[in-house]
Amino acid sequence: VYTMSKRINPSVNAISTLVVLLITITLTIVNVLPMIRKKTSPSKQNKPWKWAVAGVVVVGLVASLFGLNKSAGSQPYAGQTLHVYNWGEYTGENIISGFEELTGAKVIMDNFDSNEQMYIKVANGDAYDVLVPSDYMIQRMMQEKMLQKLEPETRKECLGELVDAIKGLPYDPKNEYSIPYFWGTVGIVYDKTKVSEEDLEKDGWDIFLDQKFKGDIYLYDSERDSFMMALKALGYSMNTTSQDELNDAYNWLIQCVQTMDPEIVTDEIIDNMAQARKALGLIYSGDAAYVMSENENMGFYMPKSGTNLWSDAMVIPKNAKNPKLANEFIRYITSYDAAMDNSSYVGYTSPNKEVTEELGGKGGDYDGINAYTPRAGYDKDEVFQYDETTRKIIADLWSRVKVAASNAH
């Protein structure tokens, strides 16, 4: 259960001052005023009026203390602001309002479209308290000393909530800098009325070269994901730095775009596959889960040659203005209620083990939808590793693939 850490707040001093002041007033009323009344109205001095007045004062004291303590204790960050930089449409509908109500802080959330866009903005000095980059970008930012370590309390509390498969991934082996926000895999979304499981088992990633599906496939406009697919189809590591292996993957993709007439898309694949506009496509597991929930004829397959196990995680940049509140936010997001809101609304897999089991289990929102629960512990699945030289090579080769695709029409 998430409980906001208790910290000394300046308003405690105000409470102490109020206690002293009101007790002094009460004693004055009870002890001084009767002497005045004795001089002016001796016949009434034995009436219990002074206890009534004292009672009113005491009630007022208790009410004042309760109200002030409630405000100070339950909203220790009142008046503060948290700046978050996250992907678009990646937050549950009650996440922000829930955290603001709990802490009294105001949350300002900006959105980015790519890890590279986020990196450039932060590298240029824009200050955020919480970022939600992908695994390989977190590794890069750690290498460049752009992040600060999490509080020990945050690390301990959050790790206790996480699915084992998402703990200690290679980019941050001890989770000293990051706590997962969502996770998943990359796979093939397919129309079960057009594509058989036998085809998928036989071809794996090479199904994107099967002439039976020419003109009926989507590729995803991402050099990392497209080269991952090609490298895995060829039996290579997706983290290879071999120029020969990268060239082989390039030729595989060239063959695909020149012979298969694919449509290269981004998020359009979600609605298009939900409407069964093509037979199959390269997709993130969370998007596939949505497609399958919208269309019962859709399936999701992860080839046996392996795929990418990815994670987007929360980190705190070195130049964060409110790291204490940032740690509070990270603990909040990992808690059951917030994680449930996030995952049930967005559709991506929660790192919170209880939420994942509930949503993906019997009677859950994603019961029977295998895309919601990523394959874990498979030795041929990999997490992306950051290598600047390889990144530049792949970016250049992917640009050539897209030119070839345009010329093929």
Named regions from a protein language model:
Residues P374-H409:
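Conserved C-terminal helix/tail region of periplasmic/extracytoplasmic solute-binding proteins
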Residues I36-T81, S406-H409:
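Short, low-complexity disordered leader/linker segments with a strong preference
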Residues V1-T28, V32:
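Interhelical loop and adjacent transmembrane-helix boundary motif
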Residues M137-R140, A274, L280-N297:
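A ligand-binding cleft/hinge motif common to bilobed small-molecule-binding domains
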Residues D312, P317-Y378:
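Mature extracytoplasmic/periplasmic domains
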Residues A127, V132-R277:
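Extracytoplasmic ligand-binding site segments that recognize negatively charged/polar headgroups
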Residues G67-L68, G73-E144, D271:
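Early extracytoplasmic/lumenal segment of secretory-pathway proteins
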Residues N247-C256, E294-K318:
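Periplasmic-binding protein-like
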